[in-house]
């Protein structure tokens, strides 16, 4: 767990400051999202993922007239293909979840949420979730039922991370290394590659007061 210390003063043409954090897993930057999910599920022997990933690669192989293996997934179009594979797997799972929901309702279980109960005093928690763009994590400090501190590390934080203190590039930068560009004046290949991660601009937007004064106050009734 690190601490974010903003260094921004004003806009500078020569500056290379990024508002994004540089999260690491065991000291290394990570790519998150559909491709990561598909590769991890294949490594875990998940049969539905294997079924649809194999079908996708077989289809591409027939169109290309040559065998296209799993290594081809590490590419711009591979990330889009992984997104389609993931959607197919999730559609099958959704049908199963729907049947389970209907069965629960038939037994009289109509609950839609669990009402939260917070003990008195300071409580700390963290939650991880696999969102469509990739892994999403939230950290929170709650004091007597009120949020005292909150931080998110979202999928785009991982993928768009700038180089860290060990000079390790984030996923965007790493994916662009060696990427051919037909026209340097119109580097559409760069745009296409970054778009394949489905970037979220809001994930790098923050409102900060340099003197640590409250920026906005919200009253919840």
Name each region found by the language model.
Residues 1-221:
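Metal/cofactor-centered catalytic core regions of large enzymes
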